[in-house]
């Protein structure tokens, strides 16, 4: 299933982004209200997935074995909208997925190396970790991704350095 724990917050206003980003302020004050329990987020995402696929079982043209298989969520893509590393309880959420034997892949914009460190230090790394690299240099990044934090380039380089040492 594809989901995000940070739908209302991102610290960039990428020119190519199709998501509504008018509310993104750079202060991420909206994330202060993101207190949802990680287990509730995971369970709600699974229930949403099951609702989404519920109509396929009645279609005679659909492989019923595939319908049955799709009812067991095996993978979570944490990348739908917003910046997931802004969710303070992300380590707990990733551990919850692991406890349910669900693989996870996380896509980050790289502006929060401190969360990557926390994931590493708390043994909460996702199954796969991706960082969007949208530009080759600071000037182009600023033009394309329109970061809302002043020290964005240092943060990008910090995340890349951290990722280089992860296993």
Model region roles, listed by residue range:
Residues 1-7, 21-41, 47-65, 69-70:
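N-terminal [4Fe-4S]-dependent radical SAM core
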Residues 1-20, 77-79:
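N-terminal pre-triad scaffold of radical SAM enzymes
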Residues 8, 20-22, 134-138:
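Short connector loops/turns at beta-strand edges and beta->alpha or beta->beta junctions
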Residues 13-15, 26-27, 116, 142:
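Intrinsically disordered, low-complexity regions enriched in proline, serine, glycine
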Residues 15-18, 46, 91, 95-98:
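Amphipathic alpha-helical interaction motifs in eukaryotic regulatory proteins
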Residues 17, 21-24, 148:
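Cys/His-rich zinc-coordinating "finger/knuckle" motifs
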Residues 22-36, 42, 96-100, 105, ...:
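Long, hydrophobic, well-ordered secondary-structure blocks that form the structural core
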Residues 57-167:
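Conserved AdoMet/S-adenosylmethionine-binding subsite of the radical SAM
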